[in-house]
Design a protein with these regions (language model features):
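Asp-based, Mg2+/Mn2+-dependent phosphohydrolase catalytic module
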Residues: 1-4, 107-108, 113-212
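Active-site neighborhood of HAD-like aspartate-dependent phosphohydrolases
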Residues: 1-41, 58
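Substrate-recognition element of Asp-dependent hydrolases with the DxDx(T/V) motif
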Residues: 25, 89-116, 171
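Helix-loop "lid/cap" segments that line or gate small-molecule binding pockets
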Residues: 28, 47-59, 114, 148
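Short helix-capping segments at alpha-helix termini
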Residues: 30-35, 62, 95-96, 119-124, ...
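Metal-dependent phosphoesterase signature
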Residues: 37, 53-91, 96
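Conserved SAM-binding loop
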Residues: 14, 41, 100, 136, ...
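Short beta->alpha linker loops
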Residues: 20, 43-47, 84-85, 106, ...
Length: 212
């Protein structure tokens, strides 16, 4: 039997946070007069470094620091609840001796906030790849390839769970099987870009995953 693993994005896949981030980034787009329609949707799945570089490069570094601090303060007051069925699905994977990794565009400071609120959350993963471990963020495949290397699993034997278009692209370009969660984007938007679309993890089994 071949060795396989499951790799999960965090926000919008394991944790129900994306609607909260919509509020923050919409306000930033308004505050700095970016004039980009649905700006909060365009940046989904990308790192803070990428967001600042791609959309706020016209601002001085001091203003970047203001945005960073505003985000940190916002994240400390966020609610980090589960996507339905996520934790139970991971439990089933581990019962089947399938390695589990988390691959997120969040940096270590954000993860520290999450792990403080969710004691033991970090302990369920065999590897964690954060923005601090990579030089090129999603949609580049570096993060997923690094996770596969950490776990000693060939990319073609990795299952990726993603909600954002940038993450879906990263998993696809890494040569992995991508399963899309219709949490951030409607199913119709991602259906032709993934092997399967699920609304959440309830009623989704390890056997179904392996059959894809």
């Amino acid at each position: 039997m071949k060795n396989i693993c499951a790799l999960f994005d965090m926000d919008g896949v394991l944790l129900d946070t994306e609607s909260q981030y919509d509020i923050f980034w919409h306000s930033m787009g308004e505050k700095y007069h970016l004039g980009i329609e649905k700006f909060e949707k365009k940046i989904k799945g990308t790192t803070l470094v990428s967001i600042l570089s791609n959309y706020f490069s016209h601002l001085p570094e001091t203003e970047h620091d203001v945005i960073k601090q505003s985000l940190l303060d916002f994240e400390k007051n966020m609610t980090y609840s589960d996507i339905p069925g996520a934790m139970k699905f991971i439990e089933k994977l581990k019962e089947n001796n399938i390695k589990v990794g988390m691959v997120t565009s969040s940096d270590d400071e954000k993860l520290s906030t999450v792990f403080t609120q969710r004691a033991g959350f970090d302990k369920i993963f065999d590897t964690i790849v954060s923005a601090n471990r990579i030089t090129q963020g999603k949609p580049h495949p570096m993060c997923y390839l690094l996770a596969a290397k950490d776990l000693g699993i060939d990319p073609e034997n990795c299952y990726v769970f993603e909600d954002a278009l940038s993450g879906i692209q990263a998993g696809t370009d890494a040569g992995m099987t991508v399963i899309g969660l219709a949490t951030t984007n409607p199913a119709e938007l991602i259906r032709d870009k993934v092997s399967k679309v699920i609304p959440h993890f309830e009623d989704f089994s390890v056997e179904e995953m392996k059959a894809i």
